[in-house]
C-alpha cells in the first residue's frame, strides 16, 4: 500500500468506500470448512525434483501424514493404501509466501489457488484478522492461505493509512510509542508496521511521523520482541528508517538511483527488504499484472474482477519522481550486498492480485539480479526465517505440508512456478478444479450479459443534455450526489441545473461543494447510474467512449468508471479542466472495459481541501 501518482493513495479496498456511499456491497469472508470427511491429509509424492527451501534434490519422495511432512528421501516405504502421486519431471516446492499484502474478503482463498500458502499482511482490519485466526485454530481454514498481520499500522493524523474508511488510532508523540505498540499487540498484531512517507516521491505533501517517532516505535516493538517494518517510497526515508533500527523495509524506493553506500548501510543494520516490484512497476503507469492475464497457465483461474485489476496501472502525474529502473537498481545492489530479499506484491493494488501476482514478483526479482533459485528462496525459507515461522517455508520432516507442485524446473525458468499442478495447505489439496469451473461459469455469465438488451432509452447514447431545465437523465437511475461522508469524511456536494451550458446550450449540471481534510482520500461529485438502480449493471457494449463537456475552477477533477467485472474498483481518468468549456472524449478501452457491465460514472473533485465548483454538459456514450 503506497501513495500513488494520480489516484492519491494506493488502496486496500480503498475506492470501495465510494461504492459504499452509494449502497454497493463488496465481497466478504466466505465461510471456510474443515477437511472433507475421509480426507486424511496423508499421501506420498514420488520421484519429484524437490526444492526444499534451500537446495534442489533430484528424484525424491516426500511423504505426508496428517498434514505434516513425515519423511524426505528416495524409494520411501509407506503404509498399504496410501495415496501416491507420481511427480516424475515435476518440481515440488514449499508453499509460497507473499510477504506484503492487504487482506480482506476472499483474498486468502484466492491466494491459495495460485500456490501462496502464507500471506504476511501489512495493514488490514484487525477484526478480520482475528476471525481468520479463529478459523485457522479450529482447523476450518484449510482451503485458504494462512495469515500473519501487522493489523493497524502506525501513522500520524491525516497521514498515509488513514484514508481507507477504517477508524484507526494515530500517534501524536514519541512518548506515546510504547502504549501505542502495546495496544496493537493486544489487538493481535504479529509485527508492527510504520508509515514514514510524505508523498514527495509523487509530488504530493502529506503529514508523516518524525524520525524520533519512528525510532521510538521501533524501540517499543523491540521491547516486546516484535519486528518493526517501515513503509517508505523515497531513499531519504529508507535511509532514515534503517538508521532508526528498523528490521525491514516493506517497499523499495523509485525516486532516485541507490546511493553507493545505501546497500551497505542496510546490510550493516542486518535489515531485510520486501521490494514489492510489481506495485512499483504499476505505479509508473505500467500494468504489471497484464502479462499474467495473458498467460494460459494462469488465466483459466483468474476471475473477471481480478483480471480487470491486473490490467490496471496508476496514471502517472508529471510531477512524479518514480522511475522503475531505480527500484530494480536498488534491489540489485541490496542483493549483491547480501541483504535478505523477500517476495511481496502489495496486492490488491492496481496491477496486482492476491496469489497470482507473486509469480510476476518472482519474475521481476530475477530481472533485478536474483537467480531463479534465489527468487524461490525469497518466497519460501527466507520469509519463514525472517518472520520466525519455523514450521513452514521448507520441505523437511516435521514441518507443515504446505506444498506447491509445478510442471517443469523453476530453477532454470522462474515462470515455471505458474505451471501449477497442485497446491496443498497442511496436506489439504486446494480446490483448483472448482476454482477453474467457477471462472468458466463466470465467463458464460459475461457472455450472457453481453447478449442482454441495453437499458431502455439508451439507444442514442445521450445521458443528459440538460436542455429541459432539470437534472434528469434519458435512461438509468439518474444522477445523485456521492461524497466521502460514509468513510468518515466531511466533504459536501450539491448538484443542480443552471442556465447557460456548453456551446450556447440552454443549461448544464452544476456540481459544487467543499472538499474536507477529514480523510486523506476525499471526494465529492455527481454519480450517474446507467442501470435501473444504483450499481445495477447495464449492457452498454454497443458504445465505445464517453463524451462530455466540462468546465471548472482550476482544481483537479476526475472521471471514475465502475463496472461489475472491475470488482467495483473504478478505472480513473484525470481531467484537464479549465474555466472555459472543453469537450473531452474518453475511450472505454482506455478505462479497461468494453461497457458490457457498466455500473456507474462518477465526476468528482478531490484534494486539496477547499470549495469547488464545476459543471458538465451534453454527457453521452457513443
Regions found by a protein language model. Name each.
Residues 35-41, 54-93:
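Histidine-rich, glycine-flanked metal-binding segment
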Residues 95-103, 162-179:
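Active-site mouth loops of central-metabolism enzymes
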Amino acid at each position: 500500500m503506497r501513495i500513488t501518482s494520480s489516484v492519491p493513495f494506493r488502496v486496500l479496498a480503498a475506492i470501495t468506500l465510494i461504492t459504499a456511499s452509494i449502497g454497493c456491497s463488496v465481497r466478504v469472508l466466505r465461510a471456510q470448512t474443515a477437511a472433507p470427511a475421509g480426507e486424511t491429509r496423508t499421501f506420498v509424492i514420488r520421484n519429484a525434483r524437490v526444492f526444499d527451501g534451500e537446495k534442489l534434490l533430484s528424484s525424491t519422495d516426500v511423504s505426508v501424514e496428517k498434514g505434516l511432512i513425515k519423511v524426505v528421501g528416495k524409494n520411501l516405504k509407506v503404509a498399504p493404501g496410501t495415496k501416491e502421486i507420481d511427480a516424475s519431471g515435476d518440481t515440488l516446492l514449499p508453499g509460497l509466501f507473499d510477504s506484503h499484502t492487504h487482506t480482506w474478503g476472499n483474498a486468502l482463498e484466492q491466494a491459495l489457488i495460485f500456490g501462496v500458502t502464507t500471506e504476511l499482511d501489512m495493514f488490514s482490519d484487525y477484526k478480520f484478522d482475528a476471525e481468520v485466526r479463529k478459523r485457522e485454530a479450529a482447523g476450518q481454514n484449510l482451503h485458504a492461505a494462512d495469515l500473519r498481520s501487522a493489523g493497524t499500522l502506525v501513522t500520524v493524523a491525516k497521514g498515509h493509512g488513514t484514508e481507507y474508511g477504517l477508524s484507526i488510532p494515530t500517534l501524536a508523540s514519541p512518548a506515546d510509542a510504547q502504549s501505542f505498540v502495546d495496544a496493537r499487540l493486544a489487538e493481535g498484531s504479529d509485527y508492527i508496521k510504520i508509515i514514514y512517507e510524505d508523498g514527495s516521491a509523487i509530488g504530493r505533501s502529506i503529514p508523516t511521523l518524525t524520525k524520533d517517532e519512528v525510532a521510538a516505535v521501533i524501540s517499543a516493538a523491540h521491547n516486546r520482541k516484535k519486528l518493526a517494518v517501515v513503509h517508505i517510497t523515497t531513499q531519504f526515508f529508507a535511509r532514515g528508517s534503517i538508521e532508526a533500527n528498523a528490521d525491514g523495509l516493506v517497499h523499495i524506493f523509485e525516486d532516485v538511483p541507490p546511493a553507493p553506500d545505501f546497500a551497505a548501510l542496510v546490510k550493516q543494520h542486518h535489515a531485510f527488504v520486501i521490494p514489492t516490484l510489481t506495485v512499483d512497476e504499476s505505479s509508473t503507469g505500467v500494468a504489471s499484472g497484464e502479462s499474467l492475464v495473458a498467460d494460459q497457465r494462469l488465466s483459466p483461474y483468474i476471475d473477471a474482477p481480478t483480471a480487470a485489476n491486473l490490467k490496471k496501472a496508476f496514471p502517472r502525474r508529471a510531477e512524479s519522481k518514480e522511475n522503475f529502473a531505480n527500484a530494480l537498481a536498488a534491489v540489485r545492489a541490496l542483493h549483491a550486498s547480501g541483504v535478505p530479499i523477500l517476495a511481496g506484491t502489495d496486492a490488491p493494488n492496481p496491477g496486482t492480485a492476491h496469489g497470482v501476482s507473486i509469480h510476476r514478483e518472482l519474475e521481476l526479482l530475477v530481472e533485478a539480479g536474483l537467480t531463479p533459485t534465489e527468487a524461490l528462496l525469497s518466497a519460501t525459507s527466507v520469509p519463514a526465517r525472517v518472520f520466525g515461522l519455523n514450521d513452514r517455508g521448507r520441505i523437511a520432516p516435521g514441518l507443515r505440508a504446505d506444498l506447491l507442485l509445478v510442471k517443469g524446473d523453476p530453477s532454470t525458468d522462474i515462470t515455471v512456478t505458474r505451471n501449477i499442478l497442485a497446491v496443498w495447505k497442511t496436506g489439504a489439496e486446494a480446490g483448483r478444479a472448482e476454482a477453474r469451473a467457477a471462472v468458466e461459469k463466470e465467463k458464460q455469465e459475461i457472455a450472457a450479459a453481453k447478449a442482454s438488451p441495453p437499458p431502455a432509452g439508451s439507444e442514442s447514447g445521450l445521458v443528459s443534455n440538460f436542455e429541459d431545465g432539470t437534472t434528469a437523465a434519458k435512461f438509468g437511475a439518474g444522477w445523485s450526489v456521492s461524497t466521502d461522508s460514509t468513510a468518515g469524511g466531511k466533504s459536501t456536494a450539491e448538484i443542480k441545473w443552471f442556465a447557460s451550458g456548453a456551446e450556447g446550450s440552454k443549461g448544464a449540471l452544476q456540481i459544487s461543494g467543499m472538499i474536507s481534510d477529514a480523510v486523506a482520500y476525499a471526494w465529492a461529485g455527481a454519480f450517474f447510474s446507467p442501470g435501473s438502480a444504483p450499481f445495477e449493471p447495464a449492457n452498454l457494449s454497443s458504445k465505445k467512449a464517453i463524451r462530455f463537456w466540462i468546465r471548472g475552477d482550476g482544481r483537479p477533477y476526475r472521471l471514475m468508471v465502475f463496472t461489475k467485472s472491475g470488482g467495483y474498483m473504478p478505472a480513473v481518468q484525470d481531467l484537464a479542466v479549465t474555466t472555459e468549456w472543453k469537450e473531452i472524449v474518453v475511450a472505454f478501452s482506455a478505462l479497461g472495459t468494453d461497457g458490457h457491465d457498466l455500473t456507474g460514472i462518477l465526476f468528482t473533485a478531490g484534494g486539496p481541501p477547499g470549495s469547488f465548483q464545476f459543471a458538465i454538459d451534453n454527457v453521452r456514450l457513443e
